[in-house]
UniProtKB/Swiss-Prot annotation:
Protein name per the record: Uncharacterized protein A
Compositionally biased tracts (Basic residues): 250-260
The entry's keywords: Plasmid
Upper classification of the organism: Eukaryota, Fungi, Dikarya, Ascomycota, Saccharomycotina
Superkingdom, natural source: Eukaryota
Positions of the UniProt region annotated as Disordered: 213-260
Length: 260
């Protein structure tokens, strides 16, 4: 099935144009945004109805174009009010649903979120996004900005491709996993993510992250020990050379034998 949406027949007077980057910005930036009124919960997406869709509402009087955090490439329909409703990943415009299912589709009332949740790649992607959200809450305060900036670097890639949500690729999963690993590495060594309540929901993913974190800490400890051993070896050699210069050769050899 071709998930590309042909927007050639859209008119500025009738439709909003939702792109994948719009949905991703809403989802990933919801933590930073003071305008996010609800949060997306993919765990119940298979039971979603039209009224269950999470919505992100911009307060009345807010000009979207002047808010960089919530700027989107909409084809806006004329309205007297500047209040808009921004829709998250679990939400799709009715027009898009009709285009995908056809005007006489077998189930035109099926929520689009339910269609997405049937896609294995999408389910993995949204799980990783939720994991990023969880880990961000535990990142040390000194590294929060750095962590957010790292995640926000994912945006240009999505925008350049102008993708629609179901066109998520394996490379997207790989990129988000790398971002997740980087965040986990920034957590304190005293933080045991297996103790988080969410660990029961994603046991495999959490265990994988813990193994990688422990492996990294082991390598770091090993490299630190090797560095200390090299430093101590240099000190011993320097001390030996100094003592050899100060003492007669015969006595120094006997001293070496006794210490061995």
């Amino acid at each position: 099935m071709d998930w590309k949406i042909d927007t050639s027949d859209l008119t500025a007077t009738r439709y909003y144009a939702y792109s994948a980057s719009d949905a991703l910005v809403v989802l990933l930036r919801r933590i930073c945004s003071p305008y996010a009124t609800r949060r997306f919960d993919s765990s119940s997406c298979n039971k979603m109805s039209q009224t269950d869709y999470p919505q992100y509402e911009i307060k009345t009087g807010t000009d979207v174009s002047q808010n960089r955090d919530l700027s989107f490439d909409y084809m806006k329909k004329p309205t007297k009010s500047t209040a808009k409703v921004l829709r998250g990943v679990g939400v799709i415009d009715e027009w898009f649903a009709k285009r995908l299912l056809g005007p006489r589709g077998s189930n035109p009332d099926l929520p689009f979120a339910a269609l997405l949740c049937r896609d294995e790649l999408y389910r993995e992607w949204i799980t990783l996004i939720r994991m990023l959200t969880l880990v961000l809450k535990h990142v040390p305060k000194a590294k929060v900005k750095e962590a957010h900036d790292m995640i926000l670097e994912l945006y240009p890639n999505y925008r350049r491709r102008n993708i629609f949500i179901p066109e998520i690729k394996e490379s997207d999963i790989h990129d988000i996993k790398n971002a997740l690993r980087s965040l986990v590495r920034q957590l304190s060594s005293r933080t045991n993510i297996l103790e988080w309540p969410e660990a029961a929901k994603y046991p495999t993913l959490f265990e994988e992250l813990v193994r990688e974190k422990r492996s990294q800490e082991t390598q770091k400890t090993s490299s630190t020990k090797n560095l200390l051993n090299r430093r101590n070896a240099r000190k011993r050699r320097r001390l030996s050379s100094d003592m050899a210069a100060e003492r007669p050769a015969g006595k120094w050899k006997n001293r070496l034998r006794s210490t061995q």
